[in-house]
Amino acid sequence: MSTSATASPSLVGAAEPKIYNPWNPANKEIPVAEIARINRCEPKRVELYRQACVHKSFVAREAHEGQLISPRPDDCMSLKHADNEHLEFVGDGILDAIVGDYLERRYPGEGEGFWTSLRSDLVNNEHLGGLAMKLGMAPWLIMSRHMEEVCAGRSNRRMLGSMLEAWIAAMYRDRAADDPKTAFWRVQQWVIEVLETHVDFGELIACNTNYKDQLLRAFQATFHQPPRYKEVATEGPLHNRIFTMGVLHPDGSVLTTATARNKKEAEQEASRLALIRLGFAAS
């Protein structure tokens, strides 16, 4: 009788598991001395600032079906248990309030449109990322190897901007644990000092790149209504979507379209193109 082996049906055509390798030897835990340098005072709750440095790509997670996590090299830190997204949300609200109050006092009488436009320029992630670089935060951003090598790593201003917002929330909670009544004021003073040290307000006002705001003003003046935006197309998997957004003419037709990896960027570019097409800006 033949005893030749046959392949198990369950293994025939089985896909090789994908190897997930988040390990990044460039990651470093921020020292207490660096936190104190950035804050200009000693921190009480160091863990908050360290969490503010963690991008979601370097957080421990369950491996997806058919995926294995590669062993951690000796020169890499362990995955973190929490990222900075919750802190970023809180910091975003705190920063909006501080900057809004500051601009109203710095430029009295300019009006809501001017303040809103300038605040938008100051607190957008690209600009905040530039401030984070000037503060020396970039070396302490913790991220996956993929984000480091493929997504611009420590030069990625959007990630650094999110880190700065999370840092502001960490500072607020650190101070609030010690003295809740003065916590906001202390954070406010720090933010204002950063702005007045590192921002050229004259240049920022002269180089307004908030095209959505510019288009809003142009539409209100010309058509007496705000512009409307429409999602024209969405492509790609959930984790890597590409959006095409359109600006609608008051008659309902699509005036211009633009494509980007998030809706806000696509709307900004579509707004810029609409300003040119309608003759409100030079190409």
Where are these regions (language model features)?
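Double-stranded RNA-binding/processing signature
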Residues: 1-283
